A protein has these predicted regions:
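Cleavable N-terminal export/targeting peptides
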Residues: 1-24
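Repeated loop/turn-to-beta-strand initiation elements of outer-membrane beta-barrel proteins
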Residues: 5, 61-64, 110-113, 139-149
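Short glycine/proline- and aromatic-enriched beta-strand/turn motifs that initiate or cap beta-hairpins
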Residues: 19-65, 161-171
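Outer-membrane beta-barrel strand-turn architecture
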Residues: 21, 56-60, 105-111, 141-143, ...
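Predominantly the C-terminal beta-signal and adjacent terminal strand-loop region
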Residues: 24, 74-78, 128-172
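Transmembrane beta-strand segments that form the barrel wall of outer-membrane beta-barrel proteins
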Residues: 27-39, 71, 111-123, 145-155
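Residues on the lipid-exposed face of transmembrane beta-strands in outer-membrane beta-barrel proteins
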Residues: 31-35, 48-56, 70, 99-105, ...
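Flexible, solvent-exposed loop segments that connect beta-strands
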Residues: 33-43, 71-95, 121-129
Length: 172
């Protein structure tokens, strides 16, 4: 009888503990526009991108997860004087595929900030990959969408490709 009472007590206790658990894992996808800064501004001035995130809530205030997407920057055209004529050369577009881990901190229900850290693969022939970082700030528009602002950087040997991004992200 004593074993049955203890068993029943632990079953009720485990039920209560599991009833308190809330699964905070979710997927986010969105798009952004960007403008380049620093060395990158010599080669491109505007970019667009796709962002994909998988969040896992580790507490009410913190999330960890994985991030990827595509960052596409439009190459600048340059004009070269060849004798009496000018020749316009089309600048090469630059494309990165970031593979990163991230963290997010939620000081309020509608604002979060954090950062992505990982490696960005260069997808075109003349672009190498490098260390990727992206601090972010996000403001919820609704329970399923948010405005997302970030500063993104890819460190390639002695140069850093940097940009400021702004976009919309949707929660699924």
């Amino acid at each position: 009888m004593r074993k049955h009472i203890l068993f029943s007590f632990f079953m009720l206790l485990s039920y209560q503990i599991m009833a308190q658990y809330v699964d905070r894992s979710f997927f986010k996808a969105g798009f952004h526009a960007s403008t380049t800064l620093g060395d990158a501004a010599d080669f491109a001035n505007l970019g667009i991108g796709l962002d994909l995130y998988q969040h896992w809530g580790i507490s009410k205030k913190f999330d960890l997860g994985l991030a990827t997407g595509v960052q596409y920057y439009f190459g600048l055209d340059s004009t070269i004087d060849v004798g009496p004529t000018a020749v316009t050369v089309r600048g090469e577009d630059t494309v990165f595929l970031p593979l990163a881990g991230f963290f997010r901190f939620y000081p309020t229900k509608s604002i979060n900030f954090g950062g992505d850290i990982g490696y960005a693969l260069g997808l075109n022939e003349s672009t190498d990959g490098g260390f990727y970082y992206r601090p972010t700030l996000s403001f919820d528009l609704s329970p399923s969408s948010a405005l997302n602002f970030s500063y993104a950087g890819v460190v390639i040997e002695d140069n850093t490709w940097t940009s400021i991004t702004g976009g919309v992200i949707f929660r699924f």
